[in-house]
């Protein structure tokens, strides 16, 4: 569909494909640490990892949803000349679910406490290392 000053592009999510088999792909355990600071491109990567089961996510849910809006477009309001911005893209979950606006949930949920941070202890990293070394 054409707009007055641009174009609208839509992608049919049914045409998106899952990553195929690749004999070069690493077959060992892969842990990806996530949390409330996981956002933007890192959140999109986390989304694909979760939906395609490419690795095990460890930590706490991301603060940004898998379905989110971005790609900021700046413009000036014609009558007031006020500068404004709006999002011009919706980024969708890799699984095609456009209704889920919650954060990406980890496979293994672990949270650092304020005391952990104060004592320079990383409970999330420790749990990831345990999972890799012991398989649980």
Feature map (PLM): residue ranges:
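Loop/turn elements at helix/coil->beta-strand transitions in domains of secreted/extracellular proteins
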Residues: 27-29, 53-56
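Gly/Ser/Thr-rich loop/hinge elements
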Residues: 1-29, 67-76, 88-89, 99
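Low-complexity, Gly/Ser/Thr/Pro-rich intrinsically disordered linker/tail segments
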Residues: 100, 104-136
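Active-site-proximal beta-strand/loop segments in catalytic clefts of secreted hydrolases
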Residues: 33-37, 59-62, 86-91
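Terminal peptide-recognition signature
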Residues: 30, 49, 96, 128
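Soluble non-cytosolic domains of exported or imported proteins
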Residues: 24, 36-43, 115-123
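C-terminal regions of proteins
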Residues: 66-112
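Extracytoplasmic/secreted cell-surface and envelope-processing proteins
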Residues: 39-45, 66-69
């Amino acid at each position: 569909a054409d707009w007055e000053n641009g174009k609208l592009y839509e992608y049919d999510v049914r045409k998106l494909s899952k990553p195929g088999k690749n004999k070069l792909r690493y077959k060992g355990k892969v842990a990806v640490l996530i949390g409330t600071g996981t956002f933007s491109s890192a959140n999109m990567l986390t989304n694909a990892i979760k939906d395609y089961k490419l690795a095990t996510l460890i930590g706490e849910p991301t603060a940004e949803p898998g379905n989110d809006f971005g790609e900021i477009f700046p413009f000036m309001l014609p009558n007031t000349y006020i500068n404004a911005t709006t999002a011009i893209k919706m980024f969708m979950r890799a699984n095609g679910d456009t209704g889920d606006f919650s954060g990406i949930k980890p496979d293994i949920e672990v949270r650092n406490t304020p005391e952990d941070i104060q004592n320079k202890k990383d409970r999330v990293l420790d749990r990831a290392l345990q999972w890799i070394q012991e398989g649980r």
